[in-house]
Amino acid sequence: LAAWARENEIWLVAGSLPTRVTGESRLHTSSLVYGPDGSLQGHYHKLHLFDVDVADGHGHYRESASFVPGEQWCVIDTPFGGLGLSICYDVRFPELYRQLRAAGASVLLVPAAFTHVTGEAHWLPLLRARAIENQCYVVAANQCGQHGAGRRTWGHSVIIDPWGQVLAEAQENVGLIQAELNPQFLKQIRHDMPVLNHARLRSGWREPE
């Protein structure tokens, strides 16, 4: 991964990946961020584990049987803005994304393996909501296809702007999507509708001058 980032001179977000936990038989579900020089710029361990029942061929999902949750949110500073890291089921917990926004995120990253059932119903509405309420770009890459044990994932990887508009979307297949992120557009939206300044349930949040 480091070599790919270095050879192509890109920022690379690799997630999610299983990573070892010292003293634990279980693993973390993690995202790793590499800079264009190949250096590891930061990592995030998934906070919210998917222990749910879904009306699909798999039925019972118990992520905690194999994984332990992380303890800390993460924003990575880059030349094009802060990258707020999250993974899959995290997207159902808006308080995480508000924290990422308050910590300087302008792009929210959501690598995922949303099931076909939950994805068809909730994938796009949840992602658009996180983009709109936090006035951030959202880049969400979702697994697709039929897997073992009756599991099927939704695909439809997507890029969304801070106004909630879909800039690019894949279908239920493997593919490549891209979109241009406009810092001035993001700045204008935050200026015109300063939601952090209006938030009353948490104190001390102000839009940077």
Question: Regions from the language model: what does each represent?
Answer:
Residues F50-H58, L176-Q178, P183-Q188:
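Short, surface-exposed linear segments at secondary-structure transitions and domain or protein termini
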Residues A3, T22-A103, H116-G119, P125, ...:
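Active-site catalytic loop in hydrolytic enzyme cores
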Residues P36-S39, P79, P162-G164, L181-Q184:
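Short loop segments at secondary-structure junctions
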Residues A14-S16, S30-V33, C74-I76, S157-I159, ...:
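Short beta-strand scaffold segments in enzyme catalytic cores
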Residues Q184-E209:
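A short C-terminal boundary segment appended to hydrolase-like catalytic domains
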Residues L1-A14, G82, C88-I177:
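CN hydrolase (nitrilase-like) catalytic-core segments centered on the catalytic cysteine
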Residues T19-T22, Q146:
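Short glycine/acidic-enriched loop and turn motifs that connect beta-strands
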Residues L17, H45, Q143:
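Histidine-centered beta-alpha loop that forms part of the nucleotide-sugar donor binding/catalytic region
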